């Protein structure tokens, strides 16, 4: 089912297969040594016999990720925030480095090198996929381990679909996810909180900051509050605030992609 031909200083493995539509095709793969060609010949013949042969595909990592986002964002009804964050991660942290690589040619070693590159990459190196000119100070602020872990999580999910779509046999990611360095956050004490409130002159901002401190509300929860969420006539006479909704910044493109109507 497969044969080896010497072509100049290399060896080619020639075989026949059927594409996704059942159309007969011919495949050629070149190798530097005869041993490599023989090993590939054995593998191809085995895969053609047991049905595990992967139809050669030129899809790149960038094409895979855009296809995955398009399908999954609709299927799972992503929020505008999730969509925007995923697109930004693909544009700025993945495509500039491995976006042009063919999915079927990507190996675990390539991903390991990619993660190592990200660990040395400054924050904001790419914006909307365009490389930025950074100051010396900006270059010193590197991507966090959390950001690299998020890239790993996104790739793991996307490549799992590549396996389902018969593009690859297995996910080409390292067995262990990138380690996250947990940094303890600095929390304001009561003195700092009071000093901040005394500094703020804008009444609306003062109220928002006060509520975030006293009630531990997030920015989106505070901005989402309406008069109907306030009850000044509670039974205990203290009044209540009901947090029933949240507000978030949404990219116009995300809204149009998720709800074209």
Residue ranges, per PLM feature:
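Short, Lys/Arg-enriched alpha-helical recognition elements, typified by the DNA-recognition helix
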Residues: 57-163, 177
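Short, Arg/Lys-rich segments that mark the N-terminal edge of DNA/RNA- and chromatin-recognition modules
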Residues: 1-30, 240, 245, 251-254
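Glycine-rich, flexible loop segments associated with nucleotide phosphate handling
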Residues: 24-31, 82, 131-151, 238-248, ...
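Basic, Lys/Arg- and aromatic-enriched nucleic-acid-binding interface segment
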Residues: 124-129, 136-145, 149-151, 164-227, ...
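Conserved tyrosine-mediated DNA breakage-rejoining catalytic core shared by Y-recombinases
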Residues: 7, 184-186, 191-192, 225-261
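N-terminal helical hairpins
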Residues: 29-58, 71-79, 92-93
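Short, basic/aromatic-rich helical patch in the C-terminal catalytic core of site-specific tyrosine
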Residues: 13, 111, 155-159, 216, ...
């Amino acid at each position: 089912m497969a044969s080896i031909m010497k072509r100049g200083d290399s060896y080619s493995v020639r075989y026949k297969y059927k594409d996704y539509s059942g159309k007969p095709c011919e495949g050629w793969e070149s190798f530097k040594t005869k041993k490599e060609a023989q090993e590939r010949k054995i593998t191809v013949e085995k895969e053609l016999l047991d049905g595990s042969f992967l139809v050669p595909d030129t899809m790149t990592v960038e094409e895979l990720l855009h296809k995955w986002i398009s399908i999954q964002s609709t299927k799972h009804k992503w929020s505008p925030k999730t969509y925007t964050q995923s697109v930004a991660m693909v544009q700025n942290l993945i495509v500039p480095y491995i976006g042009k690589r063919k999915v079927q040619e990507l190996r675990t070693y390539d991903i390991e090198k990619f993660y190592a590159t990200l660990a040395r990459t400054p924050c904001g190196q790419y914006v909307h996929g365009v490389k930025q000119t950074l100051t010396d100070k900006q270059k010193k602020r590197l991507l966090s381990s959390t950001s690299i872990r998020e890239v790993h999580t996104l790739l793991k999910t996307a490549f799992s679909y590549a396996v389902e779509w018969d593009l690859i046999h297995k996910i080409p990611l390292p067995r262990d996810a990138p380690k996250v360095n947990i940094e303890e956050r600095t929390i304001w004490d009561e003195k700092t909180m009071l000093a901040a409130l005394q500094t703020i002159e804008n009444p609306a901002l003062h109220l928002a900051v006060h509520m975030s401190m006293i009630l531990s509300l997030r920015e989106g929860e505070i901005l989402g509050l309406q008069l109907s969420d306030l009850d000044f006539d509670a039974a205990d006479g203290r009044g209540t605030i009901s947090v029933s909704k949240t507000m978030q910044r949404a990219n116009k493109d995300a809204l149009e992609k998720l709800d074209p109507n």
